Each structure stands twice: as C-alpha cells, then as structure tokens.
Regions:
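A detector for small-residue-rich transmembrane helices and their helix-helix packing motifs
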Residues: 1-162, 171-172
Length: 172
C-alpha cells in the first residue's frame, strides 16, 4: 500500500522532490489505514454537503494536505510521514466553522480534544505508528482557512471587496 516515492521524506524533499508535500497524503501504511481515512473523508462529505460545495470540500482538503506537510517540514523535525489524517483534521475544522447551531462548535471541540490527546500517543487505533504532529498541523491549517474564509464571507456581506475583488470596489 505504501508508495515510497510518495511519502513525506525530509531528505527527499531537501533533494528537490517537492511533489511529496501533496503526495504523502495519498500514501498509507496499510489498506486498513487507507480505508479508515477514506471513511472519515466520506463522513466529512456527508456532514458538509449542506454547507459546502464538492469543489470547496476537495479544495480545502487539498490545501490542508499541503499545509499539513508544509507545517511538518517547517515546524517539526519529523523525517517521514504518510496518510491523510492531518488533512482530514483540517477539513473537519474548516467545516465545523460552517455548520449551524451547536453542531459546529461541538465538532470543533471534539476534534481539538482528540488532537490534543493524540500528542502523547505513538500508535494509532490500528496499532500502526502515529505522527500526531500531522493532526496538529492539519487542524491549524483548517482553522486558518476557516478564519480566512469567514473574513472573506463577512467582507462580501458588508460590501467590502475582500471576497469580490477590485470589481466590487469599482461598482460601489
């Protein structure tokens, strides 16, 4: 299941293999690891389908995937990483900011507690090695995207051209 040429490898990235920033999120330790991530992604799509388009969901997932591995590269000493768990944490954090009522804050609280508890774990629920830093960086990226998209939405609603660009400014 693991494609060595896809894994986040600090040494390989230092040698110019920058595709690993994205590809590492699509390589997994095992089929159960892949299936678990795929199930979480499917659940996230079902949860967010009323508040986000499929393009937004995929776009945020991909941004969180790259943001997670960039965070690992720049903000940790982790040498090797595979899996989409970090990107999924980011997608769910971003999605929580869009969910109505208590659902969003509740999801974000549970996600944050889980990521905090992960920081002291070395094995996943599958008994495979865990890189909790990935969950942390994914969560951070998702929260950053939630803040940015929230600002852009509120800018558009107030008439400020933050979301609509220069064209909206010239129309005012």
């Amino acid at each position: 299941m693991l494609a060595q040429s896809w894994a986040f490898s600090r040494l390989a990235i230092d040698d110019g293999e920058i595709w690993r920033f994205a590809a590492a999120n699509f390589a997994h330790l095992s089929w159960p690891h892949f299936a678990g991530n795929l199930l979480v992604f499917a659940a996230a799509v079902l949860l967010l389908r009323a508040v986000a388009t499929p393009l937004e969901i995929v776009g945020v997932f991909l941004l969180c995937a790259i943001g997670c591995t960039l965070g690992l590269y720049l903000g940790s000493s982790l040498a090797w990483y595979v899996g989409a768990s970090g990107a999924l944490c980011g997608l769910l954090a971003w999605g929580a900011s869009r969910l109505p009522g208590a659902i969003g804050p509740g999801l974000l609280a549970l996600l944050t507690i889980n990521v905090a508890m992960d920081q002291s774990r070395t094995l996943s629920w599958l008994g495979e090695p865990l890189a909790p830093q990935g969950h942390y960086w994914g969560l951070a990226c998702g929260l950053a995207l939630a803040i940015i998209s929230g600002w852009r939405a509120s800018d558009a609603a107030s008439g400020w051209p933050g979301a609509a660009g220069a064209a909206a400014r010239s129309d005012a």
